[in-house]
A protein has these predicted regions:
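N-terminal secretory/membrane targeting signals
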Residues: 1-42
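Hydrophobic alpha-helical membrane-insertion segments
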Residues: 140-145, 283-300, 375-399, 475-479
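Long, internal scaffold/assembly segments composed of regular secondary structure
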Residues: 233, 241-354
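Transmembrane-helix bundle segments that line or gate the permeation/cavity pathway
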Residues: 44-270, 284, 298-303
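Transmembrane alpha-helix/helix-exit interface in multi-pass inner-membrane proteins
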Residues: 296-306, 344-355, 379-413
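Hydrophobic alpha-helical transmembrane segments and adjacent short intramembrane/lumenal linkers
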Residues: 376-384, 394-396, 400-441, 450-451
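Juxtamembrane boundary at the C-terminal end of a transmembrane helix
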Residues: 482-490
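Interfacial loop-to-transmembrane junctions
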Residues: 449-475
């Protein structure tokens, strides 16, 4: 998106003065938030051991990029441009595509559940764990940001509910169906936030051997689907899908940032990130985003040197409180770490909005938190890419042989059962560059959205810029947190 044209020669001196004030204010925010480590190692399978430039230079370079971006936005983006978001119709898709995708989603769900129950219980031989933790959890998040809501058309429980509703309507021969219950406004997206937190607990806290057990994952998938179907029957299919279905809401939030929007039988194009402006903030939305960022952060933290030092103290705390089982004390410690990291993320954002309130204009901190919640979405996908890129690049290759032998029974359906993943497909340096690049792009995107929203809320551009000193501090703090976690990972 092009910046607005600059003014005439007479305004250059004032702009230089404004730029200087903005730069000094931004520098103050950076110095307040920047805490960077001296060691760097990529999260995932390979460690970074031979970076081409010093690690501290990476960290300061990212902070400088954020400051330069902030100054550029303050001087070259004087009026709001993104609210409301604009898109253009691009292509139409046939009406049969949606039910076809739904049928594919149901078939895949049946395959994953059947493989988990009836297949080999070895994690590397059964398709279920890799599909859930790599393709579904990570791959679909990235696909949603690139191509739009990739999960919605394939959502198996939504497809089952819609097919059931269609059959019931045919059986009733035109008789009106019972109206769904009104969805409680106070409930908002809290069910989705709780669902994502529970999945993160399964992935990061539960017993390592148990969390990847194919049969357990299959039964959990069946249980989750049953809950969704019951909730859809009570509150309506689309209402629950947009508010309560944890994974539908999770991927839907990522899809807001995609350059493509699928709606009304057509594909619409827009600039990346700008769709986040349309985020409908309801109860539980900010908590959900905090869970998204905090759980990803804890995944990296729990593999790092800081957690290795902290964990024994937490373990001793719970044993001193009467927890006799070592496994239980371990789970309690990790649970506290997970919840604590989510609270830290939420607290950092809350501090930023409390600081913005000092600018005046009559906005309360809670109102500002809701109005700027969409600015956290680019950070959430930045953390996903930074922490899971190596997982997707290396473990994702396992799908090549698993599709030929999904149950681990020795089959070779597509002739790829003997494929060996290439662990040298990307180097450690490439992993590091992708991770740092994702953090920079995500936080610059968040700054852009925050700056545009500030221009919408504050009458004077100067007040809008001053309010964003606090948001810049938050963004740099999130960047520093991400780099610190990556660098401390073992």
């Amino acid at each position: 998106m092009a910046f607005g044209a600059l003014g005439g020669r007479g305004s250059r001196r004032s702009r230089r003065s404004v730029s200087a004030r903005v730069a000094f204010g931004a520098l103050g925010g950076v110095l307040a938030a920047l805490v960077v480590p001296s060691a760097a190692a990529a999260h995932g399978i390979q460690l970074v051991t031979d970076l081409p430039i010093p690690e501290w230079l990476f960290a300061w370079a990212t902070a400088i990029v954020l400051v330069v971006s902030f100054v550029a936005l303050a001087t070259l983006w004087p009026a709001p441009r993104l609210d409301p978001p604009h898109d253009r119709a691009w292509r139409h898709y046939p009406p049969w595509l949606d039910p076809l995708c739904g049928a594919i989603g149901i078939a895949l769900f049946v395959l994953i559940v059947y493989a988990g129950i009836a297949g080999a219980q070895l994690v590397t031989a059964n398709i279920t764990p890799t599909w859930i933790y790599v393709v579904f959890w990570v791959g679909l998040a990235v696909a949603s940001v690139l191509f739009g809501d990739a999960f919605r058309p394939f959502n198996p429980w939504r497809a089952i509910a819609r097919a059931t509703a269609w059959l019931v309507s045919r059986m009733r021969r035109g008789a009106p169906a019972p109206e769904p219950l009104p969805y409680p406004a106070w409930l908002g997206r809290w069910p989705a936030a709780l669902g994502i937190l529970c999945f993160a607990w399964l992935e990061l806290v539960d017993n390592p051997a148990q969390r990847v057990e194919p049969r357990l994952l299959a039964f959990l998938a069946l249980g989750y689907a049953a809950v969704q179907l019951v909730a859809m029957s009570l509150y309506g299919i689309e209402t629950w899908t947009e508010r309560g279905d944890a994974f539908a809401v999770y991927f839907g939030l990522f899809a807001l940032m995609a350059p493509l929007r699928w709606a009304d039988g057509g594909i619409h194009r827009r600039a990346p990130f700008v769709g986040a402006v349309a985020l409908e903030v309801m109860p539980g939305t900010i908590a959900l985003i905090a869970v998204m960022i905090g759980s990803t952060s804890f995944d990296g933290l729990s593999n790092g040197t800081v957690w290795i030092s902290l964990f024994p103290h937490l373990f001793s705390l719970f044993t001193s409180l009467g927890v006799s089982s070592p496994d239980a004390a371990t789970e309690y410690s990790y649970t506290l770490g997970l919840v604590g990291m989510v609270a830290i993320v939420g607290g950092m954002y809350r501090l930023g909005t409390l600081g913005m309130r000092s600018i005046g204009a009559g906005y309360e901190a809670g109102d500002l938190a809701r109005r700027f919640a969409h600015t956290l979405l680019p950070i959430s996908i930045a953390y996903v890419v930074a922490h899971y890129f190596s997982l997707l690049a290396f473990s994702g290759q396992s799908m090549i042989y698993l599709v030929s032998d999904p149950l681990g029974t020795g089959a070779n359906i597509f002739g790829t059962a003997n494929f060996q993943p290439n662990l040298a497909i990307v180097t450690g340096n490439v992993v590091w560059y992708v991770q740092v690049g994702a953090l920079i792009v995500g936080h610059v995107g968040g700054l852009m959205l925050a700056h545009d929203r500030a221009l919408t809320l504050y009458r004077r551009a100067r007040d809008a810029t001053r309010s964003q000193y606090w948001m810049l501090t938050v963004m740099v703090a999130f960047t520093s947190l991400g780099l610190w976690i990556l660098s401390s990972t073992q």
